[in-house]
């Protein structure tokens, strides 16, 4: 997938000209990856130290990190992914929703001049579980809620596939089709992460 420059966009659709909330980070000055549980504490201390010295950090924490904190075995399907990823920047720009739209279009225009494929998409989609397992798991969650064992479960499973074309083109398509308040576009140090969520 094409993208010629390190960039992170933390997108907030409620952002306005009077109250710009979206953040655009460019030109990162450092990056760390953590795979081993024994490195977690030292890495968190490093992140905190940089924050205290006026450096901005954007971090991605794996679901497996939560399991490590609870003393539970990590999820096998996530073993090859970092527990922590953190990118560091000297500054960022605040953008309104309109300015984010304009920034996306300017990036796509740049890709057009480079004769890159600006359409982005996903093919060969595979679900980690089948429909029967999904329904059984949801029934089990409903049962636990009825018994008062829990009041809410954020149920997730992996969906894998292959992407093609422009990373930002794919982000634009998903942003239009999956309208929710928050989004993230991370294109740094070879990482390509696109995320959408109704809550922070």
Task: List the model feature ranges, each with a label.
Residues 1-200:
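Extended alpha-helical targeting/anchoring segments
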């Amino acid at each position: 997938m094409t993208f010629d420059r390190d960039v992170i966009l933390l997108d907030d659709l409620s952002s306005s000209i009077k109250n710009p909330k979206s953040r655009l980070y460019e030109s990162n000055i450092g990056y760390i990856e953590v795979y081993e549980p024994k490195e977690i504490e030292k890495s968190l201390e490093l992140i905190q130290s940089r924050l205290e010295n006026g450096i901005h950090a954007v971090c991605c924490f794996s679901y497996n990190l939560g399991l490590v904190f609870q003393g539970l075995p990590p999820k096998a399907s996530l073993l090859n992914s970092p527990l922590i990823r953190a990118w560091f920047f000297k500054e960022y720009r605040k953008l309104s929703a309109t300015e984010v739209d304009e920034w996306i279009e300017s990036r796509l225009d740049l890709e057009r001049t480079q004769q890159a494929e600006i359409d982005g998409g996903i093919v060969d989609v595979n679900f980690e579980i089948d429909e029967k397992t999904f329904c059984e798991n949801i029934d089990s969650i409903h049962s636990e809620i009825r018994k008062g064992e829990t009041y809410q479960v954020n149920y997730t499973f992996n969906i894998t596939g292959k992407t093609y074309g422009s990373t930002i083109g794919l982000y634009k398509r998903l942003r239009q089709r999956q309208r929710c308040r928050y989004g993230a576009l991370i294109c740094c140090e070879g990482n390509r992460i696109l995320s959408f969520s109704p809550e922070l």
